[in-house]
Amino acid sequence: MSDHDTLTMVGLTSTVPIEIVYASGLKPVDLNNLFICADDTERMVGQAESAGFSHNICAWIKGIYSVVVNRDLKRVIAVTGGDCSNTIALAELLERRGVNVIPFEYPRNRSKSDLAAELDRLRNTLSTSWDKIKTETLRLNRIRKKLLELDRLTYEENLITGFENHTFLVSSSDFKSDPDMFLRSWMIFLPRYGTEFRDRIG
Protein backbone atom coordinates (compact mmCIF):
# COMPACT_ATOMS: atom_id res chain seq x y z
CA MET A 1 0.00 0.00 0.00
CA SER A 2 1.42 3.39 -1.03
CA ASP A 3 1.79 6.41 1.24
CA HIS A 4 -1.09 8.05 -0.65
CA ASP A 5 -3.34 5.04 0.02
CA THR A 6 -2.60 5.04 3.74
CA LEU A 7 -3.51 8.72 3.94
CA THR A 8 -6.81 8.37 2.08
CA MET A 9 -7.94 5.08 3.64
CA VAL A 10 -10.17 5.02 6.73
CA GLY A 11 -10.33 1.71 8.57
CA LEU A 12 -13.74 0.61 9.89
CA THR A 13 -14.03 -1.66 12.93
CA SER A 14 -17.70 -2.31 12.17
CA THR A 15 -20.49 -1.16 9.88
CA VAL A 16 -20.92 2.61 9.61
CA PRO A 17 -22.65 4.84 7.03
CA ILE A 18 -19.91 4.82 4.40
CA GLU A 19 -21.63 7.60 2.45
CA ILE A 20 -20.13 10.03 4.94
CA VAL A 21 -16.64 8.66 4.38
CA TYR A 22 -16.87 8.73 0.58
CA ALA A 23 -18.37 12.24 0.68
CA SER A 24 -15.27 13.44 2.53
CA GLY A 25 -13.01 12.23 -0.29
CA LEU A 26 -11.68 9.31 1.76
CA LYS A 27 -11.94 5.56 1.15
CA PRO A 28 -13.47 3.25 3.76
CA VAL A 29 -11.93 -0.17 4.29
CA ASP A 30 -13.66 -2.86 6.36
CA LEU A 31 -10.96 -4.16 8.68
CA ASN A 32 -12.96 -7.30 9.49
CA ASN A 33 -12.91 -8.38 5.85
CA LEU A 34 -9.17 -7.79 5.54
CA PHE A 35 -8.49 -9.86 8.65
CA ILE A 36 -10.69 -12.84 7.87
CA CYS A 37 -9.41 -13.04 4.27
CA ALA A 38 -5.75 -12.89 5.32
CA ASP A 39 -3.51 -15.93 4.85
CA ASP A 40 -1.85 -15.60 8.27
CA THR A 41 -4.66 -14.90 10.72
CA GLU A 42 -3.06 -16.88 13.56
CA ARG A 43 0.16 -14.91 13.26
CA MET A 44 -1.82 -11.68 13.31
CA VAL A 45 -3.57 -12.67 16.52
CA GLY A 46 -0.19 -13.48 18.08
CA GLN A 47 1.17 -10.13 16.90
CA ALA A 48 -1.62 -8.32 18.75
CA GLU A 49 -1.03 -10.35 21.91
CA SER A 50 2.63 -9.38 21.80
CA ALA A 51 1.51 -5.75 21.62
CA GLY A 52 -0.50 -6.06 24.84
CA PHE A 53 -3.83 -7.73 24.13
CA SER A 54 -4.69 -10.50 26.61
CA HIS A 55 -5.37 -14.05 25.46
CA ASN A 56 -9.04 -13.89 26.46
CA ILE A 57 -9.91 -10.90 24.25
CA CYS A 58 -11.70 -11.93 21.06
CA ALA A 59 -9.58 -12.79 18.05
CA TRP A 60 -11.49 -10.35 15.84
CA ILE A 61 -10.29 -7.34 17.83
CA LYS A 62 -6.72 -8.61 17.79
CA GLY A 63 -6.90 -9.28 14.07
CA ILE A 64 -8.22 -5.79 13.39
CA TYR A 65 -5.34 -4.30 15.38
CA SER A 66 -2.78 -6.18 13.30
CA VAL A 67 -4.45 -5.17 10.03
CA VAL A 68 -4.18 -1.49 10.99
CA VAL A 69 -0.55 -1.83 12.05
CA ASN A 70 0.58 -3.96 9.11
CA ARG A 71 -1.09 -1.72 6.54
CA ASP A 72 0.10 1.43 8.29
CA LEU A 73 -3.37 2.97 8.31
CA LYS A 74 -3.40 6.50 9.72
CA ARG A 75 -7.11 6.83 10.48
CA VAL A 76 -9.72 4.45 11.93
CA ILE A 77 -13.41 4.86 12.74
CA ALA A 78 -13.91 2.78 15.89
CA VAL A 79 -17.48 1.77 16.68
CA THR A 80 -17.28 2.03 20.46
CA GLY A 81 -21.01 1.83 21.16
CA GLY A 82 -23.40 -0.79 19.85
CA ASP A 83 -20.60 -3.21 18.95
CA CYS A 84 -17.88 -5.21 20.73
CA SER A 85 -16.92 -3.56 24.04
CA ASN A 86 -13.28 -4.52 23.43
CA THR A 87 -13.17 -1.91 20.67
CA ILE A 88 -12.42 0.67 23.37
CA ALA A 89 -9.21 -1.15 24.30
CA LEU A 90 -8.39 -1.46 20.60
CA ALA A 91 -8.86 2.28 20.12
CA GLU A 92 -6.57 3.08 23.06
CA LEU A 93 -3.75 0.91 21.75
CA LEU A 94 -4.07 2.33 18.25
CA GLU A 95 -3.98 5.88 19.58
CA ARG A 96 -0.74 5.06 21.40
CA ARG A 97 0.70 4.14 18.01
CA GLY A 98 -0.30 7.51 16.60
CA VAL A 99 -3.40 6.38 14.72
CA ASN A 100 -6.15 8.99 14.47
CA VAL A 101 -9.08 7.14 16.06
CA ILE A 102 -12.54 8.55 15.38
CA PRO A 103 -15.13 7.11 17.82
CA PHE A 104 -18.63 6.36 16.59
CA GLU A 105 -21.48 5.19 18.81
CA TYR A 106 -24.87 3.76 17.96
CA PRO A 107 -27.16 5.06 20.74
CA ARG A 108 -28.30 2.41 23.20
CA ASN A 109 -31.70 4.06 23.53
CA ARG A 110 -32.32 3.69 19.79
CA SER A 111 -33.18 7.38 19.68
CA LYS A 112 -33.52 8.77 16.16
CA SER A 113 -32.40 12.22 17.29
CA ASP A 114 -29.36 10.83 19.11
CA LEU A 115 -28.36 8.84 16.03
CA ALA A 116 -28.79 11.93 13.85
CA ALA A 117 -26.52 13.87 16.21
CA GLU A 118 -23.88 11.13 16.05
CA LEU A 119 -24.00 11.10 12.26
CA ASP A 120 -23.63 14.87 12.19
CA ARG A 121 -20.66 14.66 14.53
CA LEU A 122 -18.99 12.18 12.17
CA ARG A 123 -19.79 14.46 9.24
CA ASN A 124 -18.14 17.39 11.01
CA THR A 125 -15.11 15.31 11.97
CA LEU A 126 -14.58 14.27 8.35
CA SER A 127 -15.23 17.81 7.08
CA THR A 128 -17.97 17.11 4.56
CA SER A 129 -21.48 18.40 3.83
CA TRP A 130 -24.92 16.83 3.80
CA ASP A 131 -25.26 17.72 0.11
CA LYS A 132 -22.17 15.66 -0.72
CA ILE A 133 -23.41 12.84 1.50
CA LYS A 134 -26.77 12.78 -0.30
CA THR A 135 -24.97 12.58 -3.65
CA GLU A 136 -22.92 9.61 -2.44
CA THR A 137 -26.03 7.96 -1.00
CA LEU A 138 -27.73 8.08 -4.40
CA ARG A 139 -24.64 6.63 -6.07
CA LEU A 140 -24.26 3.79 -3.57
CA ASN A 141 -27.99 3.04 -3.45
CA ARG A 142 -27.94 2.22 -7.15
CA ILE A 143 -25.48 -0.56 -6.37
CA ARG A 144 -27.37 -1.64 -3.24
CA LYS A 145 -30.55 -2.01 -5.29
CA LYS A 146 -28.77 -4.55 -7.49
CA LEU A 147 -27.60 -6.42 -4.39
CA LEU A 148 -31.14 -6.59 -3.02
CA GLU A 149 -32.24 -8.26 -6.23
CA LEU A 150 -29.25 -10.59 -6.12
CA ASP A 151 -30.26 -11.61 -2.60
CA ARG A 152 -33.83 -12.27 -3.66
CA LEU A 153 -32.70 -14.37 -6.62
CA THR A 154 -30.59 -16.41 -4.22
CA TYR A 155 -33.23 -17.36 -1.67
CA GLU A 156 -36.37 -17.25 -3.85
CA GLU A 157 -35.23 -18.56 -7.23
CA ASN A 158 -31.96 -20.31 -6.41
CA LEU A 159 -30.21 -18.64 -9.36
CA ILE A 160 -27.22 -17.35 -7.38
CA THR A 161 -25.07 -19.57 -5.19
CA GLY A 162 -24.77 -18.85 -1.49
CA PHE A 163 -21.04 -18.25 -1.88
CA GLU A 164 -21.54 -15.69 -4.65
CA ASN A 165 -24.25 -13.99 -2.63
CA HIS A 166 -22.06 -13.86 0.47
CA THR A 167 -19.07 -12.50 -1.45
CA PHE A 168 -20.96 -9.56 -2.90
CA LEU A 169 -23.04 -8.70 0.17
CA VAL A 170 -20.18 -8.81 2.68
CA SER A 171 -18.03 -6.71 0.35
CA SER A 172 -20.74 -4.05 0.24
CA SER A 173 -19.77 -2.89 3.74
CA ASP A 174 -17.10 -0.76 2.04
CA PHE A 175 -17.58 -1.64 -1.66
CA LYS A 176 -13.94 -2.73 -1.57
CA SER A 177 -12.93 0.94 -1.12
CA ASP A 178 -13.94 1.64 -4.72
CA PRO A 179 -17.64 1.56 -5.71
CA ASP A 180 -16.85 1.96 -9.42
CA MET A 181 -14.54 -1.05 -9.36
CA PHE A 182 -17.12 -2.98 -7.32
CA LEU A 183 -19.73 -2.24 -9.97
CA ARG A 184 -17.36 -3.33 -12.75
CA SER A 185 -16.79 -6.65 -10.98
CA TRP A 186 -20.55 -6.98 -10.80
CA MET A 187 -20.88 -6.43 -14.55
CA ILE A 188 -18.21 -9.07 -15.18
CA PHE A 189 -20.16 -11.48 -12.95
CA LEU A 190 -23.52 -11.04 -14.72
CA PRO A 191 -22.78 -12.69 -18.11
CA ARG A 192 -22.55 -16.12 -16.46
CA TYR A 193 -26.31 -16.09 -16.07
CA GLY A 194 -27.43 -15.12 -19.56
CA THR A 195 -29.22 -12.22 -21.22
CA GLU A 196 -32.56 -12.65 -19.42
CA PHE A 197 -30.87 -12.51 -16.03
CA ARG A 198 -28.80 -9.45 -16.99
CA ASP A 199 -31.93 -7.63 -18.11
CA ARG A 200 -33.62 -8.32 -14.78
CA ILE A 201 -30.80 -7.33 -12.48
CA GLY A 202 -28.32 -5.20 -14.43
Feature roles, as predicted:
Residues 2-8, 120, 124-202:
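A charged, amphipathic alpha-helical module
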